[in-house]
């Protein structure tokens, strides 16, 4: 069980701080049911409520600094399997995002990055599906790593590149 003040990942939205754990005083809500009150750190003023008894697959622990460093160093070894069928590719992207798994998210980032380079060589742009999932995956992964490693978001990509090259 999470407690007030914990930071978690709300899949697929954002890093959130648990502001409260308890029953909600809102109309249409079971007043005997406990909820986590989450405050997304990048969406000031927003609130997300998740039933305490229904968190599986919806929130997860944020990774530790040590795990973040180990993850970054393992990024070159993450396999990015290409999927030729456009519909199946979007389904795989969606599954990776909804899993909340940094490894799966990094794999689709690598895949889309490679597709972007290949399409650029052909004088083409990325598909809107690839572009949309690339931005979402990049936001999810880089936001968590930036937060955990205390590196400004605008510098995290270079930080990762420098770490991989070291």
Predicted regions and their residues:
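Short, solvent-exposed secondary-structure boundary/capping segments
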Residues: 24-35
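Loop/turn positions that initiate beta-strands
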Residues: 5-6
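A short macromolecule-binding patch
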Residues: 37-52
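Absolute protein N-terminus
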Residues: 1-2
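Charge/polar-rich, low-complexity and marginally structured segments
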Residues: 53-166
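Conserved nucleotide-binding/hydrolysis micro-motifs of P-loop NTPases
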Residues: 23-25, 43-45, 55-56
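Short beta-strand-centered aromatic/proline hotspots
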Residues: 14-24
């Amino acid at each position: 069980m999470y407690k007030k003040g914990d930071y978690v990942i709300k899949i697929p939205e954002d890093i959130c701080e648990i502001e409260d754990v308890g029953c909600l005083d809102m109309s249409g809500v079971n007043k005997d049911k406990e909820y986590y009150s989450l405050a997304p750190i990048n969406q000031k003023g927003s609130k997300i409520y998740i039933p305490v008894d229904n968190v599986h697959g919806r929130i997860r622990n944020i990774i530790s600094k040590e795990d973040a460093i180990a993850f970054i160093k393992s990024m070159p070894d993450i396999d990015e399997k290409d999927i030729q069928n456009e519909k199946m590719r979007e389904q795989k992207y969606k599954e990776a995002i909804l899993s909340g798994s940094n490894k799966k998210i990094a794999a689709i980032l690598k895949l889309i990055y490679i597709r972007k380079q290949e399409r650029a060589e052909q004088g083409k742009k990325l598909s809107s599906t690839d572009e949309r999932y690339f931005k979402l995956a990049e936001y999810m992964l880089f936001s968590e790593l930036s937060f955990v490693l205390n590196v400004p978001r605008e510098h995290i990509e270079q930080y990762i590149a420098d770490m991989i090259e070291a």
